[in-house]
Amino acid sequence: LEMAGFDHAALVELEPAACATLRLNRPAWNVIEDDLRRFDGRPYQGIDLVAGGVPCPPFSKAGKQLGAKDERDLFPEAIRLVDECRPQAVMLENVRGLLDAVFDDYRNKVEKQLKKLGYVPGWRLLNASDYGVSQLRPRVVFVGIRKDLAAGFSWPEPLKTEPPTVGELLHDLMAANGWRGADRWREQASTIAPTLVGGSRSTAGQTSARLAQNAPGPPWARRIRSVLRSMSLLVPPAEPYSCW
């Protein structure tokens, strides 16, 4: 959104670590560390866009797909904020499971509520790799445009070019400290990245754990990462050194 030209009036996030990261990288932004359910959108009436990613577990195929019965479902809160802020547009993203037939009634209910507020709603499954991102990341994007502006909106067309491979994209970083295996790594990393599987607040994600386990390094480095894994304190490794 920043690259698209938007200025952020407020960012609401519950996780302290995520808020700390935002404040570190964007100190001028208004980061509000709080539960979205307690956030009052009325002071922000007239903003251009309400955007966010509501929790995915209620709709994920990896979970029970409880939808509205899941206490983590924040679509109602997003609609409340749209009602309070009355932006020109709303954009929300979620997992592809939201388009499953089991959620037809749920999506229809969301559309009905947005139409009642004066918006033209639409859903689409978009894949980041179709737009130049070197990762397989399909996401359902919901867009609601204020009725008087809806005629000017169209969904983006996929690019005709393939995104760079992970090796092409990250080779210079992997070679930054003189790692002799960087060229071979580039050849082996000849595809885009898979979807990274996240974890809960208390456990590391499955993909992150697998990548950490397979990371190159001397025995002492592998031992340290093993301890970090057991403590759910996984962190991305720095660029490999020439001794690796």
What are these regions, as identified by a protein language model?
Residues 22:
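Conserved SAM-binding loop
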